[in-house]
Curated annotation (Swiss-Prot):
GO cellular component terms, semicolon-separated: endoplasmic reticulum membrane; GET complex; Golgi membrane
Encoding gene, per UniProt annotation: GET1
HAMAP family in the cross-refs: Get1
Localization (cell): Endoplasmic reticulum membrane; Golgi apparatus membrane
Record family assignment: Belongs to the WRB/GET1 family.
The name this protein goes by in its record: Golgi to ER traffic protein 1
């Protein structure tokens, strides 16, 4: 690895941080609710939990009493439950608006702090050599050019061949794997490992449909078909 190892470490940090944010996407709503610093959102959250506990209490009370023996009390509780449902719906909508604004802020922070710096680093240091080749002719010229200059070399290779008559790699010294190709290979490896883990470990195997026994199959084949009369007309020759 070249002396500029900080570039590689920064790329690994950006990739791992992006994966952590991807894996924890289902928990981010709870984090947004807990990390909201506005006093209005905290007040709405406390009101929501108070009303929710009151609603649960009234439901338990209605289940414990009889509607025939305590009709007035049961009707009063039902009326309160309807009012609580409306209040809970209003507060829930306000909390969702707050969470939506928090998600927008988080998306901007992620864009400014993760996506843009990683993109700038990849463009700025795309020709940085991560691994050097021990020999110049270790691989074919086309492969060496792609690893040294990225996939753009593969696209411009035919033009270079038509202009010079050969694929010149002499200007690609020292020969090795560039940062752009190394990042592409690392991300492809991580995605492949994720796919294998999901398919082999996380996802449950699909069991085949149950097969009918031979005796049941024979019984179905031997069972006579029932004929139904759908018309009462009789035709005479």
């Amino acid at each position: 690895m070249d002396s500029g190892g900080w570039i590689v470490y920064c790329c690994i940090f950006f990739i791992l941080l992006g994966k952590v944010l991807e894996y924890t996407s289902s928990y981010q709503d709870k984090w947004f609710t807990k990390l909201t610093l506005t006093p209005e959102a905290r007040k709405l959250n406390s009101q929501y939990h108070e009303l929710l506990s009151e609603r649960l209490r009234l439901q338990e009370e209605n289940h414990s009493i009889s509607a025939q023996d305590n009709y007035a009390r049961w009707t009063k509780n039902n009326r309160k439950l309807g009012e609580l449902d409306k209040k809970l719906g209003t507060i829930r909508d306000k909390l969702q608006e707050t969470n939506t604004s928090s998600k927008k802020v988080f998306g901007r922070v992620k864009l400014i702090g993760l996506t843009i710096p990683f993109w700038i680093l990849k463009i700025w240091q795309r020709s940085h050599v991560v691994y050097h080749f021990p020999k110049q002719d270790l691989f074919p010229k086309l492969v060496t050019g792609v690893w040294a200059r990225g996939w753009l070399y593969l696209a411009l290779g035919p033009l270079q061949y038509l202009r010079n008559g050969s694929l010149n790699i002499q200007d690609y010294a020292p020969h090795g794997v560039s940062l752009g190709i190394w990042i592409w290979a690392l991300q492809a490896t991580i995605n492949t490992l994720e796919f294998l883990v999901k398919q082999v470990i996380l996802e449950k195997p699909v069991s085949p449909p149950p097969q009918k026994s031979k005796s049941a199959t024979k019984a179905e084949t031997k069972r006579p078909e029932k004929l139904e009369i759908t018309d009462d007309k009789v035709e005479l020759d």
